[in-house]
Amino acid sequence: MNIGAKRFFSEDVSHVPEIKDPQILQVFRDFMAANWDELPNALISAAKKAISKNTDDKTGQEILAKVFRAAVAVEEFTGILVSLRMELDDTVGMSGENVKPLSTEFKDALKVAHDRYIEYLGSFGPDEVYLRKKVESELGTRLIHLKMRCSGLGSEWGEVTVLGTSGISGSYVEQRGL
């Protein structure tokens, strides 16, 4: 490194994998741009078509298959988190007029949801940082919604991030080029 030269913290980190097939790349980009709360049917059918098509880009198909599986898992998990939030809202009221300590059953459900979230994030390999960030962003938002409505949660809830900016490499600010 030269004196006075700029050095970017993640200049050697690839944010997205290399996909050669244009159709697979387009579906991959659509998935990464979509909200995974409720996947559109058109996106699901495009993914199935791209994954099953005959192409030389087997690596691209494998990457898209991983993203598709993650999106489906996030969609299902988001449904569970929204159900928990709605149950909590029904219990304490939308404005908190019936505030009371959480039931043991609800505390256990929150702990299981948090533990599964942390375990799922830990399952991504070093070459899947892009996917981990997307999952972290999608599920982190829902967990934060639960966290804001509850008091007395353990310090482990501090691990939940909103924007998935748990590191400088690939952070929201860096990707925006600010």
What are these regions (language model features)?
Residues 142-144, 172:
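Positively charged, low-complexity, intrinsically disordered RNA-binding extensions
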Residues 1-125, 129-132, 154-178:
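N-terminal organelle-targeting presequences
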Residues 134, 138-141, 162:
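Charged, alpha-helix-enriched surfaces in structured cytosolic catalytic cores
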Residues 137-138, 145, 151, 158:
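Membrane-proximal amphipathic alpha-helices
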